[in-house]
């Protein structure tokens, strides 16, 4: 009550921010007559004038009124479009490191030209981030004439572009691209073997369109560049045959693992657990299939990989549904983005889940992958000096933007008042009753000539509604992941009188629905339209437009509530743009996933008390409130998951930054010999310490062991025993110095043969390759640590602190291994002539190019980990402590990855 009173007196924080910015808008408006008087050349010259002022020390912020006035005037001349005052406000919000919430149809694309131009003046580059390639290309081409008129260059960053084209795109003043491509380029740059292979500049200013979709919905999705691990497709097929014999428990009891069924499903956490009965049955079936020996347990250490296969297969069957989570097309399993309803070609689930789904669907099983480099969007976008974003729906997530990205959310007012009617939800007992009610509503609306957009949350649901509409004889268009090729055409004409369009999640569609349809699309369909034809098309459109306005504008039907209120608001936001009339209503049933998991008992009880008859709906503020609370619960849970993921990923992020900084410094220098010499001293000191403890008696020395180690690991034949026999007075310090001097001498002889320049080149290559190889193994080890760290909670230890402590110890061990591996490799290398070295370098470059083209894999799960090659090998056979480590380091297992197990 008190807060409401204070807000009334002083205004909200949002009001105060806008009040401050409106003063600048008045200044910009006052400059308009002055700008109109300038010739085109004088207006263009303003860009160079601004750049010169910045170079002299003037701040970018001080240029806002003039720069925005210049862009507005240029837009009038190039596009015939003048920025509204609210768009100027939006531009200032975006320059202010904030999230601008601007409603659909308020011209976010044109608004973005203001801060993009302003921040590009410094010459450091601006990255405009969109959710898909189509929008990146469309926005870049639409805005290119304006930016080029003002003397700014525009680049487009698309997947599959060759490195020179990417470098050119990044060198432009303003670059358009997708969040995925910016992230993957960052990872690829940090896998480059020469400075020339890198494409990105320093990350300066990112302007993110549909910011909620990228920074929140996809925050749990790490970007991963992966390489193939070993083939285990047969095992997936064998385990897949067993799963249909298992029965799901009717009442879920994931805490005690007791019950009548063989496995329980936790739909909230998206996890599957075997019950005790299920474990007994699956062990029997595995023995029958000859996969496991009689008397063995599925939980024994030797069967860890088998347990991994069983869990993946169970999840594939119990949690992942065809035409909801994925589609099968041309013999391939393609993931469907749960937030946008789009297919994600080339993306694969990790942890063997994708292979398990392929086995379930009977398509070809592709190899598992091993992580080579990864980063989450949360950490990638925090690398920018300055970050801002815009969306139609951000206010519900304002707390998350503030706490994770330190971005305030500012709601920008609409240019015209919003007059859409949002009708209360209708709740039915069953799915069938709900669908029938939707069909009746559509019949009624279309009879009056009102266009209807039906939003569904999955392909499966959109096809159910489509079948019912076909039965009822209602013409309609379906827009989902299966038919996305003609997406823009369908959306453009969704405002036609009496048009019915069914669409899976409308988030990120990026195309406005014009009432009466799009006359521009009709003109574009003609080969060479005449002035008369265009005039006739416009006149016909005006008649249709007026008819739709009279019928009440676009009507939105939601077939069920989404987990997030924000995505419901996005669907509603397709109607009522720019002050147009419109309406919306959600139809729900007690069988909907959200209602079943979160709101069922309370609302079901309420409906029973009211004595509901079949086909009757409940429409009450209490129900709407209960549903909103259920959505808040889910949002809160998802926020906690993202926050926790970030806390864990921050540990890896600190290590990633340290490694990438070191790697970039290494790339930028041509001579690393000082580093090599320093490392050599450390490595030989530690090696000798292991056999000749410092300040120890000679009786404690293990000279044969030291000689063998020097021979095996450094290819050095040193008669240390002979030296000691011939020179009894040889003490420890002198002996150490002699061993180091001998090793340097042998190395220098190699350098004389191959030449100093070639040796420097080779040293740098060895350091980079060794660093990459160890970092790859470290990522796999971190994944395994992350998977099991929660169990430390049972020992009354804080899993996060344990994870930090152990991952730091692993990181320190990796750096020690790096020193050792580099010196060992350089010592053991066989000297070749320069021509041979060049040929080897050529081969390495080809391999690096192949690696860069490798499949890019994305996790879908909250904290899913990657099944790495090393684990696959160690899981299948017992490795002796003194055997060579399977990672290929050349060290004994106990001295390498045996320490981790």
From Swiss-Prot:
A GO MF label: metal ion binding
Alphabetized UniProt keyword annotations: ATP-binding, Cell inner membrane, Cell membrane, Cytoplasm, Membrane, Metal-binding, Nucleotide-binding, Protein transport, Translocase, Translocation, Transport, Zinc
UniProt catalytic activity: ATP + H2O + cellular proteinSide 1 = ADP + phosphate + cellular proteinSide 2
UniProt GO BP: intracellular protein transmembrane transport; protein import; protein targeting; protein transport by the Sec complex
Xref: InterPro entries: Helicase_ATP-bd, P-loop_NTPase, SEC_C_motif, SecA, SecA_CS, SecA_DEAD, SecA_motor_DEAD, SecA_preprotein_X-link_dom
Annotated ATP binding sites: 87, 105-109, 512
Induction comment from the UniProt entry of this chain: Repressed under conditions of excess protein secretion capacity and derepressed when protein secretion becomes limiting. This is regulated by SecM.
Compartmental location: Cell inner membrane; Cytoplasm
Cystine connections: none
Group of enzyme by EC: translocase
Pfam families named among the record's database cross-references: P-loop_SecA, SEC-C, SecA_DEAD, SecA_PP_bind, SecA_SW
Gene3D superfamilies referenced in this protein's UniProt entry, alphabetically: Helical scaffold and wing domains of SecA, P-loop containing nucleotide triphosphate hydrolases, SecA, preprotein cross-linking domain
One of the record's GO cellular component terms: cell envelope Sec protein transport complex
Known EC number: 7.4.2.8
Cofactor: Zn(2+)
Residues holding Zn(2+): 885, 887, 896-897
Entries under CDD domains matching the protein: DEXDc_SecA, SF2_C_secA
Cofactor remark from the record: May bind 1 zinc ion per subunit.
Family: Belongs to the SecA family.
Purpose: Part of the Sec protein translocase complex. Interacts with the SecYEG preprotein conducting channel. Has a central role in coupling the hydrolysis of ATP to the transfer of proteins into and across the cell membrane, serving both as a receptor for the preprotein-SecB complex and as an ATP-driven molecular motor driving the stepwise translocation of polypeptide chains across the membrane.
Assembly notes: Monomer and homodimer. Part of the essential Sec protein translocation apparatus which comprises SecA, SecYEG and auxiliary proteins SecDF-YajC and YidC.
Protein name stated in the entry: Protein translocase subunit SecA
Protein species of origin: Salmonella enteritidis PT4 (strain P125109)
């Amino acid at each position: 009550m008190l807060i409401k009173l204070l807000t009334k007196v002083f205004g909200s924080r949002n009001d105060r921010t806008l009040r401050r910015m409106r003063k600048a808008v008045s200044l910009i408006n006052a400059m308009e007559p002055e700008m109109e008087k300038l010739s085109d050349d004088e207006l263009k010259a303003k860009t160079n004038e601004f750049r010169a002022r910045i170079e002299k020390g003037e701040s970018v912020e001080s240029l806002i009124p003039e720069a925005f006035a210049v862009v507005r005037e240029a837009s009038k001349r190039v596009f015939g479009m003048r920025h509204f005052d609210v768009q100027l406000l939006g531009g200032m919000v975006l320059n202010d490191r904030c999230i601008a919430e601007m409603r659909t149809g308020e011209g976010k694309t044109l608004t973005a030209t203001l801060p993009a131009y302003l921040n590009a003046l410094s010459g450091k580059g601006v990255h405009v981030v969109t959710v898909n390639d189509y929008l990146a290309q469309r926005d870049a081409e639409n805005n290119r004439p304006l930016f080029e008129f003002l003397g700014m260059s525009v680049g487009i960053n698309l997947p599959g572009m060759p490195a020179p084209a990417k470098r050119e795109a990044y060198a432009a003043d303003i670059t358009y691209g997708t969040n995925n491509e910016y992230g993957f380029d960052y990872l690829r740059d940090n896998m480059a073997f020469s400075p020339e292979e890198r494409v990105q500049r320093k990350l300066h200013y990112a302007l993110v369109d549909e910011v909620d979709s990228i920074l929140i919905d996809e925050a749990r999705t790490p970007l991963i560049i992966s390489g193939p691990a070993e083939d285990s497709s047969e095992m997936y097929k064998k385990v897949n045959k067993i799963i249909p014999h298992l029965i799901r428990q009717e009442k879920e009891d994931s805490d005690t693992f007791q019950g009548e069924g063989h496995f329980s499903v936790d739909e909230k956490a998206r996890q599957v657990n075997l019950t005790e009965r299920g474990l007994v049955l699956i062990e029997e079936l595995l023995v029958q299939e000859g996969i496991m020996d009689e008397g063995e347990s599925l939980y024994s250490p030797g069967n860890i990989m088998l347990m991994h296969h069983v869990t993946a297969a169970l999840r594939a069957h119990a949690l992942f549904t065809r035409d909801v989570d994925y589609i099968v097309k041309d013999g391939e399993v393609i993931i469907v983005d749960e937030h946008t309803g789009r297919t994600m070609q080339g993306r694969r689930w990790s942890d063997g889940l994708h292979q398990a789904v392929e086995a379930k669907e009977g398509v070809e099983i592709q190899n598992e992958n091993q992580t080579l480099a990864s980063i989450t969007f949360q950490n990638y976008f925090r690398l920018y000096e300055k970050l801002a974003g815009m969306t139609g729906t951000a206010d519900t997530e304002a707390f998350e933007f503030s706490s994770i990205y330190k971005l305030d959310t500012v709601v920008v007012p609409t240019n015209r008042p919003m007059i859409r009617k949002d009708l209360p939800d209708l709740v039915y007992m069953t799915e069938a009753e709900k669908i029938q009610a939707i069909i009746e509503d559509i019949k009624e609306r279309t009879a009056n000539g009102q266009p209807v957009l039906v939003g569904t949350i999955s392909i499966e649901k959109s096809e159910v509604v489509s079948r019912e509409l076909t039965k009822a004889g209602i013409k309609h268009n379906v827009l989902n992941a299966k038919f996305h090729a003609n997406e823009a055409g369908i959306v453009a004409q969704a405002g036609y009188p009496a048009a019915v369009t069914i669409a899976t999640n409308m988030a990120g569609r990026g195309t406005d629905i014009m009432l009466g349809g799009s006359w521009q699309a009709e003109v574009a369909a003609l080969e060479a339209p005449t002035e008369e034809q265009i005039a006739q098309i416009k006149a016909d459109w005006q008649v249709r437009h007026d008819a739709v306005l009279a019928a009440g504008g676009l009507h939105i039907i939601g077939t069920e509530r989404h987990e997030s209120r924000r995505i419901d608001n996005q669907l509603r936001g397709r109607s009522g743009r720019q002050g147009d009339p419109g309406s919306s209503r959600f139809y729900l049933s007690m069988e909907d996933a959200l209602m079943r998991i979160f709101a069922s008992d309370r609302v079901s009880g309420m409906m029973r008390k009211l004595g509901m008859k079949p086909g009757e709906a409940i429409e009450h503020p209490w129900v709407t409130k209960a549903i909103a609370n259920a959505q808040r619960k889910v949002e809160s849970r998802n926020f906690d998951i993202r926050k926790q993921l970030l806390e864990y990923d921050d540990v890896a992020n600190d290590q990633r930054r340290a490694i990438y900084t070191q790697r970039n410094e290494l790339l930028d220098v041509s001579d690393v010999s000082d580093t090599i010499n320093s490392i050599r001293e450390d490595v030989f000191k530690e090696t000798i310490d292991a056999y000749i403890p410092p300040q120890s008696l000679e009786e404690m020395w293990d000279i044969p062991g030291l000689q063998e180690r020097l021979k095996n690991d450094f290819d050095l034949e040193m008669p240390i025993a002979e030296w000691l026999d011939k020179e009894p007075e040889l003490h420890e310090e002198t002996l150490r110095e002699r061993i180091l001097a001998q090793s340097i001498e042998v190395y220098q002889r190699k350098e004389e043969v191959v030449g100093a320049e070639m040796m420097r080149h080779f040293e740098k290559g060895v350091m980079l390759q060794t660093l990459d190889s160890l970092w790859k193994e470290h990522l796999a080890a971190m994944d395994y640590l992350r998977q099991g760290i929660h169990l430390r909670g049972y020992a009354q230890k804080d899993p996060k602190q344990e994870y930090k402590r152990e991952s730091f110890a692993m990181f320190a061990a990796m750096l020690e291994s790096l020193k050792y591996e580099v010196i060992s490799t350089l010592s053991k290398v066989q000297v070749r002539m320069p021509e041979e070295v060049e040929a080897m370098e050529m081969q390495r470059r080809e391999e690096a190019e192949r690696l860069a083209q490798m499949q890019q894999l994305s996790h879908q799960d909250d904290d899913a980990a990657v099944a790495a090659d090393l684990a696959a090998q160690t899981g299948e056979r017992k490795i002796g402590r003194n055997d060579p480590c399977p990672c290929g380091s050349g060290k004994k297992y106990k001295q390498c990855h045996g320490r981790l197990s």
